[in-house]
Every structure is written in C-alpha cells, then in structure tokens.
C-alpha cells in the first residue's frame, strides 16, 4: 500500500527486512556514505514544509487558538515537531496570541514518546521500544529519529505558555477513529 506512489513513479525500491527502525539504520548509513538525501522527518527542509499544518489550523480558526486543542499522530515525530515549530513561530511573530493545547497520539503498539512524557519530569528517561504490528502502519516506529527535536520543542512550547501531552490509544480506538474520519471527512 505505501509503495504504490514510488513504484508508480518509476522509483527503484529496495525491500529491507524488519520494521521501520531497521530500515532507518540502513538509510542513515547510505546517507552518510553516499550521495543520498534523507527526506524523512530528520530533514529540516521537510519539517519547514510541514509547518503549514499549523498555519492551516490557525487560519481555519481565524487566527484565534484560545481554548483550542490539537491532536497529532506521532510515529517518527516529524508532524508534531512541525506543528509545534509553526505554532511557536506564529506566536513569536504576533500572528496568534494563544497557543493551543497540543497532544501527540501514539498506538499502544509503538509508544516511546508516550512512555517518556507519561512520567514526572524528574523520572523521564527515553528508551526506544520494540514495536508490535499496528493498524497505524506509518506510526510503527520504536525509536523516532526526531525525538531530540521533540524534547527541545516541547521545552520551548511550554516556556511560551503552551501545554503539551501525549496520549496512548488502543488499536480499536484507531480503527474506530479511522471509520469516523472516513465517514465525516
């Protein structure tokens, strides 16, 4: 399913056994030793483009985010870092006056960011997890490469008056939400 676009556009596709985290190790090695550009959430240019999510949400609410709550799925953590970065930029520029409450959402089958933020600050230690199969295939990541960026941006977000949290959801909740979104857009 995820290969239809690259295969359809004529890309050479290599299959790597294992899960996303195994593939990430191979891709990082290739990028370090060959002329290969990483285009995942580790690439700052991609994050800059994804900041448009935050701009679109703010525009949708006529630039008034007071009392709003955003939920963003977390796999490799590119989307959530882009949203935080975009919101912080708009706040710094005076485009918005309030930061919304922001929640990352992780499947119980791949939840290292939730595990980190579910503990009191003094007890937080980041540990990658071994993922289990999930209906949220794109989020089956046990060691998000963007985690250092998440930590830095959460600190900045909270220092600017924003609230951040992460929720863990069941596989059934993901399936139910997918059906709801498909029915209602």
Set out the residue ranges of the language-model regions.
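Short, surface-exposed connector motifs at secondary-structure boundaries
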Residues: 8-12, 65-68, 159-160
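Active-site/ligand-binding loops adjacent to catalytic centers
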Residues: 18-38, 89-185
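Buried hydrophobic positions in well-ordered alpha/beta secondary-structure cores of metabolic enzymes
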Residues: 6, 27, 55-57, 71, ...
């Amino acid at each position: 399913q995820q290969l239809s676009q690259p295969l359809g556009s004529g890309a050479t596709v290599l299959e790597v056994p294992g899960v996303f985290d195994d593939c990430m190790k191979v891709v990082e090695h290739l990028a370090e030793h060959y002329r290969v550009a990483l285009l995942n959430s580790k690439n700052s240019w991609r994050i800059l483009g994804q900041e448009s999510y935050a701009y679109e949400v703010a525009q949708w609410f006529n630039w008034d985010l007071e009392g709003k709550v955003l939920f963003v799925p977390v796999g490799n953590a590119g989307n959530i870092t882009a949203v935080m970065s975009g919101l912080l930029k708009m706040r710094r520029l005076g485009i918005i006056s309030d930061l919304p409450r922001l929640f990352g959402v992780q499947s119980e089958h791949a939840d290292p960011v939730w595990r980190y933020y579910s503990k009191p600050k003094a007890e937080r230690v980041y540990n990658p997890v071994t993922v289990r199969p999930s209906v949220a295939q794109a989020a089956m990541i046990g060691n998000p490469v963007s985690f250092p960026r998440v930590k830095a941006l959460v600190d900045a977000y909270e220092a600017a008056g924003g609230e951040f949290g992460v929720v863990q959801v069941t596989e059934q909740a993901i399936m139910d939400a997918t059906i709801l979104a498909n029915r209602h857009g």
